[in-house]
Regions:
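N-terminal targeting signals for export/organelle localization
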Residues: 1-51
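A short beta-strand-turn-helix
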Residues: 45-71
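Short pre-active-site segment immediately N-terminal to redox-active cysteine/selenocysteine motifs
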Residues: 69-72, 76-80, 123
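Hydrophobic beta-strand anchors of alpha/beta hydrolase catalytic cores
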Residues: 73-74, 104, 127
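C-type cytochrome heme c attachment motif
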Residues: 79-86, 126
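Typically the conserved alpha-helix immediately C-terminal to a functionally engaged Cys/Sec
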Residues: 85-97
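Structural microenvironment flanking redox-active thiols in thiol-disulfide oxidoreductases
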Residues: 94-97, 102-121, 149
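Non-catalytic, surface beta->alpha helical segment in thiol-disulfide oxidoreductase systems
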Residues: 123, 128-156
Length: 156
């Protein structure tokens, strides 16, 4: 019994030492910004930010008045939603590909229930596609990247 305890103790010490040792300074990441760091990412919005950056539905409840500087996509999602999780990396890729041309936002429907209710969100993921001068369109489901690119190129 003492032998087993000794072996387990030795194993625990080796494991702890190895885990704490780190990578010995290899593969250190530079603090200098790279081109990749300068690209856009999907931006999470709360209600106040949505009212400023997208649409102030409190001031203009009957008329759509887009507040953005470029076309946008708003992803209504939930952290527990499988299709939402599958869509997120696609939106991240698109935010980098269309950096400076299209803004991509996300809204957690569990945290921002008032926003979800204002747009009648009943199914997630739901995407709000917002061109500069036309009325927005809503699409539901985790669309593949090629369909989203087509929607961006044709509608936005």
């Amino acid at each position: 019994m003492k032998l087993i305890k000794s072996i387990m103790s030795a194993f625990a010490i080796v494991l702890a030492t190895t885990a704490c040792a780190g990578n010995g300074g290899e593969n250190k990441k530079s603090n200098e910004p790279t081109k990749e760091d300068n690209k856009m990412e999907v931006v999470s919005l709360n209600k106040a930010e949505f009212l400023k950056k997208v649409y102030d539905f409190e001031a203009n409840p009957n008329d759509w008045k887009f507040e953005g500087k470029r076309p946008a996509i708003v992803d209504f999602y939930a952290t527990w939603c499988g299709p939402c999780k599958a869509l997120h990396p696609v939106l991240e890729e698109l935010s980098k590909e269309y950096s400076g041309k299209v803004d991509i936002y996300q809204i957690d429907v569990d945290q921002e229930k008032e926003l979800a209710a204002a747009f009648g969100i009943r199914s997630i993921p739901t995407l709000l596609l917002i061109p500069m001068k036309e009325e927005p369109r809503i699409t539901q489901g985790a669309l593949p990247k090629d369909q989203l690119k087509k929607a961006i190129d044709e509608f936005l």
